[in-house]
Each structure stands twice: as structure tokens, then as C-alpha cells.
């Protein structure tokens, strides 16, 4: 017998939803129809012209601020294109809204330079948050890798491998093996490699949450696009842009339905200043050494080889400390 994840009713093999055994047939079919409708809705939102998207984005931001108050909302600011567009729009409504920037110790120099410009020249209300844990211990990228493993391939793959490696019971371990076999067969050979998804938690998410709690913040405004990853699109299909009082963190994601083209159009149209990194043919400003998605890049011209050209000092540090790991992961550096 099984227990449906939605209705909590027991069901046997004959009443199991064929596409996903977590649901009974009735709930599984209804969920599939709902997600299909949500995908159509997302496609419709994405097809709107830029000015309509700006109006909708401002509505969502206002909804968050009206719900929690301006003094209890903050922008999680990375210094990248998406969060800079979000900041530009939000400051039109609330010029002094708080921004929290997590210095992960793995930032591009151009990102840090842009943060200082935002603070000193653009008068953006930014607090820089460092990766200090609840015990007062300072972390950095190398320390996280040594303790937990390297962020490689994708968050889902890294999480699956970490779960397998740290399973506390034979049952959990077998479930992890089955999950990887079912979803990530091509990564099975890396199951014993030092891989983990904990990096973002230790260097960014947890320090930001602690600082937000310390400051009495109740809602985070995030400049993320649903198109950026499977997980983000799945989250939008399930919950939409503004997710209040459902989870531990209240979230406003008013750019979810934007595309990369929308972001670029907005930057050009409104002359928004972004880090010089984007003038060096980079399309993202995330952590320098992050391995998420590197396997999808051209083997002979991936982000690490680009780092060698644009930031030789940082590349030398990367090779000295993590070059051996890249060989284990079959990544050309």
C-alpha cells in the first residue's frame, strides 16, 4: 500500500498514478492538469511586452511591502544583471529599501567593485554580509569544499550525491542510489567523489538569513528568473511569484516571468549600470569557482579556461587548490 502525498489516502498498485508513484491516480491526474495550466500561464506572462512586465513587477513588489512593511522587506542583492534590474525598479518605489549582499569570498573583483559603486555613487542602501556561522566561525569557499565537497554539475546532482554519501540508514542510502539511478544515471561514476550542494547554504543563504532575522526582516525580494533552472521553474509552477506564509521564508520573486532578453532590453533602455564583468563576455556574475553547469559548456572554452584569460591570479589559486578535483570530475581546466 502507498499513501498519496496530496490527499494522504492509502492506495494500492492498481490505483497508483503511472507517472509518479507518490500520488494516487486521481490526485496525479489533477496535478498534471494543473501544472499544464500553470505552464501555459507562465508562457503567457513571458510573452508580454517589457513595459507590461515592469507594471506587473511593481505590483508584486508593492504587494510584498504592503503585506510586511518597507522596514521589514529587503532585496537579496548579488550585484548581477538580474538583481541590479530588480534594484533599479524597486528603488523607483522605495528609494531607501535595504539590500543585503553576501560576500561569499568567491566573488569576481568586478562584482565587488560594482557593490562599492552602488554604495558610494548610487546611494543604494547595502549591507555587506560575510559568511560567519552561528558560532562566530568565518567560512570561505576552500573551507566549505574541504568540509563538504565541491559544487559540481548542478544543485540537484550535488544534493543527490551528498545525500547518498551522508545517508544515516541503509534504507536512506538505497533510496539515494535508486534516485540517482533513475534521474542522474550519467553521474553515477561520481557518487564517491567529493561533491556537495552545501556551498551556497554556508556562504550565502545561511548568513543572509541570520542577518535578515537580526534586522527584523520578514520578506526577501529576489531577482531570479524561472527560466534559470529546473528547480526555479518548478517552484514557480507550484507557488507563483509571491510566496507568503507557506514556508519559513516569505519570498517575493517579481522577475520570475522575465527572460534574459527582457533583462538586457531593460538595461539598455534605462541605461542601467552593471559590473564591468559583462563587458568581458561573461553572461553571469556568480561565484568564480562554482561548478554548477560547467559540464554543459564547450569543453575547450569553459568558464575555468575563460578565468585563465581574464583573471590569471584567481585562476592560479583555483588550479593550486582545486585543479586535482577537476580531473576527478572530467572537467578540462
Where are these regions (language model features)?
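Cys/His-rich microdomains that often coordinate metals
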Residues: 8-11, 28-31, 106, 294
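ATP-dependent adenylation/nucleotidyltransferase module used to activate substrates
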Residues: 34-265, 269
Amino acid at each position: 500500500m502507498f499513501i498519496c502525498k496530496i490527499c494522504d489516502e492509502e492506495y494500492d498498485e492498481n490505483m497508483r498514478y503511472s507517472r509518479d508513484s507518490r500520488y494516487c491516480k486521481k490526485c496525479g491526474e489533477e496535478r498534471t492538469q494543473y501544472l499544464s495550466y500553470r505552464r501555459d500561464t507562465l508562457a503567457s506572462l513571458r510573452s508580454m511586452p517589457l513595459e507590461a512586465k515592469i507594471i506587473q513587477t511593481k505590483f508584486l513588489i508593492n504587494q510584498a511591502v504592503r503585506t510586511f512593511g518597507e522596514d521589514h522587506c529587503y532585496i537579496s542583492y548579488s550585484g548581477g544583471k538580474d538583481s541590479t534590474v530588480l534594484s533599479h525598479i524597486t528603488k523607483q518605489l522605495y528609494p531607501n529599501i535595504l539590500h543585503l549582499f553576501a560576500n561569499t569570498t568567491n566573488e569576481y573583483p568586478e562584482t565587488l567593485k560594482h557593490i562599492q559603486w552602488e554604495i558610494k555613487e548610487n546611494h543604494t542602501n547595502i549591507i555587506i554580509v560575510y559568511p560567519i556561522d552561528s558560532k562566530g566561525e568565518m567560512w570561505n569557499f576552500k573551507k566549505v569544499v574541504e568540509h563538504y565537497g565541491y559544487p559540481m554539475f548542478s544543485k540537484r546532482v550535488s544534493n543527490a550525491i551528498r545525500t547518498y554519501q551522508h545517508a544515516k540508514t541503509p534504507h536512506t542510502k538505497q533510496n539515494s542510489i535508486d534516485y540517482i539511478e533513475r534521474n542522474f544515471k550519467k553521474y553515477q561514476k561520481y557518487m564517491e567523489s567529493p561533491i556537495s550542494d552545501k556551498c551556497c547554504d554556508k556562504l550565502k543563504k545561511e548568513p543572509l538569513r541570520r542577518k535578515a532575522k537580526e534586522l527584523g526582516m520578514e520578506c526577501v525580494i529576489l531577482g531570479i528568473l524561472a527560466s534559470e533552472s529546473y528547480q526555479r521553474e518548478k517552484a514557480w509552477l507550484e507557488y507563483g511569484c509571491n510566496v507568503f506564509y507557506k514556508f519559513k521564508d516569505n519570498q517575493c520573486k517579481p522577475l520570475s516571468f522575465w527572460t534574459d532578453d527582457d533583462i538586457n532590453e531593460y538595461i539598455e533602455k534605462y541605461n542601467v549600470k552593471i559590473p564591468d564583468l559583462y563587458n568581458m563576455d561573461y553572461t553571469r556574475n556568480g561565484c568564480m569557482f562554482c561548478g554548477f553547469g560547467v559540464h554543459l559548456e564547450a569543453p575547450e572554452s569553459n568558464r575555468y579556461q575563460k578565468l585563465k584569460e581574464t583573471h590569471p591570479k584567481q585562476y592560479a589559486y583555483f588550479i593550486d587548490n582545486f585543479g586535482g578535483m577537476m580531473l576527478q570530475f572530467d572537467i578540462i581546466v
